[in-house]
């Protein structure tokens, strides 16, 4: 089963920053993280953690659960593109 395209969390964060007219440095400062960490988050090189989700809920809005759901949906969609399950078989009772 092919999943729909899910937005990368970093893209959603970037859209919010653009709407707020906030720079990467301002965002990093508000989140109390290094600018390099903020950059990795926005580019998808770092996954959104529960700690980041809590901070995002305060700094940008929405719930921590929404941010984690977004990350999980995107991560699962990406994994489905690369994980080869063709040789796997379901375990059954005998």
Swiss-Prot record:
PROSITE patterns: HTH_CROC1. It holds the Pfam family HTH_3. Keywords: DNA-binding, Transcription, Transcription regulation. It comes from the Bacteria. Residues 13-67 form the HTH cro/C1-type domain. SMART domains: HTH_XRE (SM00530). Residues 24-43 bind DNA. Belongs to the VapA/VapI family. Transmembrane segments: none annotated. One of its GO terms (molecular function) is DNA binding. This is Uncharacterized HTH-type transcriptional regulator YddM.
């Amino acid at each position: 089963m092919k999943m729909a395209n899910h937005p990368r969390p970093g893209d959603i964060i970037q859209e919010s920053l653009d709407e707020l007219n906030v720079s990467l440095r301002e965002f990093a400062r508000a989140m109390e993280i290094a600018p390099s960490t903020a950059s990795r988050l926005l580019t998808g090189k770092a996954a959104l953690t529960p700690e980041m989700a809590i901070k995002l809920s305060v700094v940008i809005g929405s719930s921590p659960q929404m941010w984690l759901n977004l990350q999980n949906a995107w991560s699962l969609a990406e994994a489905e593109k690369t994980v080869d399950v063709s040789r796997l078989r379901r375990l059954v009772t005998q």
